[in-house]
């Protein structure tokens, strides 16, 4: 019987920094008249015939149930008084680089997860500060003092717990999870909020009666491995606050994509192209967040019989522009010689990053 050894390195000092409602906060900073009003970064559905997707929104808008990846139309229905801003992604990228420079004052072991989120390993840092909490506070102070923006921070001995900690108290919060607090902190948490546990895994866990960290803690290691393979061992460790993944300063992302499965099959060209437009917007949002441009657009289609078709097209210049991605996706779809049949999944991916 295969049992992986449990090795828990609690000697590291990891900080997870997550900017608070980043795009919206930059807009509020640059236009103080927006403060106190619900701000939604996304196309105004009144100007686009209801099309568009929310990139992010401030905390005022979130009180109305608005959130990222929601259609702009639904966001308007929930919050008609919301102020829609299409967004200035070049400005956000420039501010993101300023934040990165602040991180570099303390350590070079930085793993950016997106334009507004990163892990920092400060076990050995440039200033010789022993307290990771002190460094997190200094970073928050620097970001506010120099950029007038707030960030939430999580501090722990691994990335998994630091990420969870940064979500505890927002905005401008700082939460620490110590080794002896890990299991207690995770026990009441919804399993869907465990970083790295996807939707399908959550569904399988629910089938097993697992809804919280405490539930997961009760499941034997071999049961999880039998159900999930090696990922089952990862789940077993996560429930115990164990994760030894290093902070990778040279982490390279090769592609960014979004896909959607439809409960009701798509048949009409109008519906299919409408969905491709929504996917293109989501891909643009993700590309912007990760500061990436790519030269190849990949369209993925899964039909009713579960057969899958993938086709790509290369561009002369790298892009992160929604209009270019949408146009190329439509061109790829138009070039297909498939007989009309129901579509259960559509996916759009951009790769070939520069």
Swiss-Prot record:
Keywords associated with the record: Cytoplasm, DNA damage, DNA repair, DNA replication, DNA-binding, DNA-directed DNA polymerase, Magnesium, Metal-binding, Mutator protein, Nucleotidyltransferase, Transferase
Q: Which GO terms describe its biological process?
A: DNA-templated DNA replication; error-prone translesion synthesis; SOS response
List the subcellular locations: Cytoplasm
Say where the protein is mainly found: cytoplasm
InterPro entries named in the record:
DNA/RNA_pol_sf, DNA_pol_Y-fam_lit_finger_sf, DNA_pol_Y-fam_little_finger, DNA_polymerase-Y, DNApol_IV, Rev_trsase/Diguanyl_cyclase, UmuC
Q: Which cofactor does it need?
A: Mg(2+)
MF GO annotations = damaged DNA binding; DNA-directed DNA polymerase activity; magnesium ion binding
> Which SUPFAM superfamilies does the entry link to?
DNA/RNA polymerases, Lesion bypass DNA polymerase (Y-family), little finger domain
- In this protein, which residues make up the domain named UmuC? 14-198
Q: Which reaction does it catalyse?
A: DNA(n) + a 2'-deoxyribonucleoside 5'-triphosphate = DNA(n+1) + diphosphate
Matches recorded under Gene3D superfamilies: 3.30.70.270, 3.40.1170.60, 5' to 3' exonuclease, C-terminal subdomain, DNA polymerase, Y-family, little finger domain
EC number per UniProt? 2.7.7.7
Q: Name the domain of life this protein comes from.
A: Bacteria
One Gene Ontology term, aspect cellular component: cytosol
Per the entry, what this protein does is: Poorly processive, error-prone DNA polymerase involved in untargeted mutagenesis. Copies undamaged DNA at stalled replication forks, which arise in vivo from mismatched or misaligned primer ends. These misaligned primers can be extended by PolIV. Exhibits no 3'-5' exonuclease (proofreading) activity. May be involved in translesional synthesis, in conjunction with the beta clamp from PolIII.
Q: What family does the Swiss-Prot or TrEMBL record give for this protein?
A: Belongs to the DNA polymerase type-Y family.
Binding partners and assembly: Monomer.
Report what the protein is called.
DNA polymerase IV
Q: Which organism is it from?
A: Streptococcus sanguinis (strain SK36)
List the top taxonomic levels of the source. Answer: Bacteria, Bacillati, Bacillota, Bacilli, Lactobacillales
Q: Which gene does this sequence derive from?
A: dinB
């Amino acid at each position: 019987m295969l049992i992986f050894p449990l090795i828990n390195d609690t000697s590291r000092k990891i900080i997870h920094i997550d900017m608070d409602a980043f795009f919206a906060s930059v807009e509020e900073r640059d236009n103080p008249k927006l403060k106190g009003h619900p701000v939604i970064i996304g196309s105004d559905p009144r100007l686009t015939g209801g099309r568009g997707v929310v990139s992010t929104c401030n905390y005022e808008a979130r009180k109305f149930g608005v959130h990222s990846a929601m259609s702009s139309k639904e966001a308007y229905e929930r919050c008609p008084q919301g102020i829609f801003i299409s967004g200035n992604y070049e400005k956000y990228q420039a501010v993101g680089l300023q934040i990165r420079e602040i991180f570099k004052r303390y350590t070079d072991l930085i793993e950016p997860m997106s334009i507004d989120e990163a892990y920092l390993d400060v076990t050995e840092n440039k200033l010789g500060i022993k307290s990771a909490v002190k460094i997190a506070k200094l970073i928050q102070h620097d970001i506010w003092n120099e950029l007038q923006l707030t960030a939430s921070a999580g501090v722990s001995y691994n990335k998994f717990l630091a990420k969870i900690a940064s979500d505890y108290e927002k905005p401008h919060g700082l939460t620490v999870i110590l080794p002896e607090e890990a299991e207690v902190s995770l026990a009441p948490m919804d399993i869907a909020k465990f970083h790295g546990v996807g939707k399908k895994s959550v569904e399988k866990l629910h089938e097993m009666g697992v809804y919280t960290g405490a539930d997961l803690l009760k499941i034997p290691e071999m049961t999880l491995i039998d159900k999930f393979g090696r990922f089952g061992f990862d789940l077993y460790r996560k429930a115990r606050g164990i994760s030894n993944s290093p902070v990778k300063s040279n982490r390279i992302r090769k592609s960014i994509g979004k896909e959607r499965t439809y409960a009701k099959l798509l048949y009409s060209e109008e519906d299919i192209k409408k969905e491709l437009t929504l996917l293109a917007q989501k891909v643009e949002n993700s590309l912007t967040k990760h500061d990436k441009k790519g030269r190849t657009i990949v369209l993925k289609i899964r039909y009713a019989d579960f057969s899958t078709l993938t086709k790509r097209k290369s561009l002369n210049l790298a892009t992160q522009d929604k209009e270019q991605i949408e146009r190329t996706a439509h061109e790829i779809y138009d070039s297909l010689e498939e007989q009309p049949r129901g579509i259960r999944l559509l996916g759009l991916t951009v790769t070939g990053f520069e």
